[in-house]
Every structure is written in structure tokens, then in C-alpha cells.
């Protein structure tokens, strides 16, 4: 990855969850420890069926009083529905922000140019008020910025990033053993 390259991940979607007991709600559902997620750390997690079969995978990021979930766009409706089923009477709000926010990825080298950036998978900081995090699955995959669509192009210009071919990003991802697309085929099949 070139230090100036940015990849607009238009196949990703964003959910926002917040509410009184959001931490306990997520702790009882996801495959990772929600206590690891804070303003300076994000994590990779899955949602499993009651039988322990894989349903959804995502990255979870602390944001304001709740959590952002960065997931595959083809899975967002199903994940939203599944989380809503588990919500029951909890005072939890689940919002699909996919039409307002976008996920962009750029290299580790560029991430390390930010003040206070650390070379640790999942390390999270803010660019203005938007979260930037080093991919928790493999830091070599670089960082992701979740940003409001209206601010995207101005922010990319200020960060001196230029749009690059998304195929390069996914080719690199595959070389690292991370398959970020078409996980619907695996639902309810893997333990």
C-alpha cells in the first residue's frame, strides 16, 4: 500500500448501538470481550447462533456513548434484525447509519503519522470526532476511518490521500488471509 492511497470500502455498512445497558447487552452476544473496546481500542468479533454457529462478523468501535459496528453491507439488514430480536425490552437503540457514514481504509504507514498513533492492532484514535482504527485482525491491513459522507472528500484532501483501486486492497487482504466479502455462504455452517 502506498502511503497516499485510500480505499473507499463501499461494501461495508455501519450500525450504531447505544443505550443504558449497551455494554452488558453486547457482552452477552458477541464472541469477544466488550470490555476490551474503549476510546483507544477496537476489536473484531462475531455473532453466533445459540448453537454456536457463525452468523455475522464485524469490527466494533467505541464512539461517543455507544458503539459503531463495521460490517459487510450484504449482512447489515440481517445483523440489524438479529440484534433487534435480542433487544427485547432493553433500552437499547440500534441505528443503521450506512447511508450517512462511509468506511475508508489506508496503510499502516499513513496511520503512524497521526499524533499519538500506536503500532498495535485495534488501536483507535480520533480524526476530529471520527474514529480511525488500526485493523484489529491484522495491522498490516492498515487503518480504517469511519466518517460522515458529507465530510469524506474534504477530509481525504486534508489528509493528502488519493483514491486507489479497491481491487488492490482486497488482493492484499486475501494475501494476509483475511476474506472480507461474501461471508453469507458460511452462515449457520461453521462452528
List the predicted regions and their residue ranges.
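Basic, glycine/lysine-rich polyanion-binding surfaces/domains
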Residues: 1-191
